[in-house]
Structure formats: C-alpha cells, structure tokens
Amino acid sequence: PANLDNLVILMADDIRLEKVAMREKLRGSLDRLIGQNYIGRTGDTYNFLTDEEQDIRERNQLTQVDTGAIVGDIAKIIFGIIYDAKKFRYGKCDFPFDQMVDNTMYGIATGGMRLRFLTAASDATEKTEFRLMNSSKGSEAIVVLGDTPYYESLEASMKIRKYVKQRNVSQMPKSAQDIIRGQQEEAAKYEAEASKALVEAIENAKFYADGEHLDIKSGNAKAKLTRRWSIWSRMFTASWT
C-alpha cells in the first residue's frame, strides 16, 4: 500500500538515508498535495484523486463547521469515553464535579468543583502561565491539552458528515455515491484518530490546581487524570477545614 513508510523506502537511494528526516519531509509534501486536492488519504494510505473526487473533496473542504460543535465532540470523547467519572471520592463521601471544555459545559452544572480542559481552539491568553495559575486558585482545576492533531481530525470528519447531510446522495450518479461512501469511511477513521490523539494530548497535558502546576510524569491518560484529580481534591477539600 502507498503508506508513508513504503513511500520513504521507495524514495531512498542510499541505505544510510536518515529515514526519520525523510519521513517528515515527505509527510509535509503529501500534506500540501492533500491541501491542493491532488491526492487523498484514508487512514495511513495515500491515493491520487480523479477529477470527480477532487471536486467533491474541494466542496467538502469549503463546508463550514462550528467551532462550538467541534469542542462539544471533544467534550463527549473526554468525559464520555476517556475519563467518564462523574464524582470524586474524599473520605467516605462522593462529590459531583462540573465538566467543562473551553467555555462549554458538559452535562449538568453542580456549582461545585470543576474540571476544565483547554483545547487548541481556546484563546492563547487563557493559556498564559499567570492566567492558569490565577484561574486554578479557586474551585477549578485546569488541564491544558498537549499538541496533537485531535482538533484537525474532528474538524475534517465534521466537514464530511455535514457535506453528506446537505446532499441528496441517493439522487447522485453511482460514481459520486461511491466517492461519498468512501469519504464516510474516511470520516470514521478521522474520528478514531481524534480519540487516539486526545488520549495522547491528555498524557502530554499540563495540569493546574490550587494555583500550582502539578507534574505527574507516569501513567496513561485516565491514570494521570485520576492521580492529578485526587491530589487536587485533597488540596481543595483541605481548604474547607
């Protein structure tokens, strides 16, 4: 298959070629060709596009999607799949907490403790060290997601889904229906990539609570969140006594 690793091997004219550098250089070139609608990518496989495929893909890319909708999907993945805890335990009691991504509340607000994630869509001023330290002094813990392509993957998927929804696909020529069917499969792969990228973004995130930057180096995404949340909940509840 025409995936990135195989293309690097095909282009190698020297066995001593620095494959990592070539891989990144080639990825950049392929991304530019995708942006110009000359080629497409499904998962890890690249392919040349026909004129009809180029036309449909260009219309896809021109489709506008709402930032709030993308953030809402990020919240569903984080709080619905990756970290689905609804309460934290302190002593013998369970306490509910608010779940938030950027400025979007997920679920019902309780008015108590809050766990908030900042995404690539949030304003840069929200992520300054001073602002993070200051905002996390009260009842809010803040997680600044690491730099992974979760946002771009969800945006690409949403554009495809919205484009298809706006078209009467059953009345299109069979060739166009086949292209759209392939793009729907591509959208599902983008969504899977976004979930994986969000896990990595949490594992590489910065966590702020009680006006401090809490550094937890080991563990997967859920374990890191649980550990950081446990530390902060002890700090927060201790301030009550």
List each model region and its residues:
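Extended alpha-helical scaffold and adjacent linker segments that couple domains
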Residues: 1-241
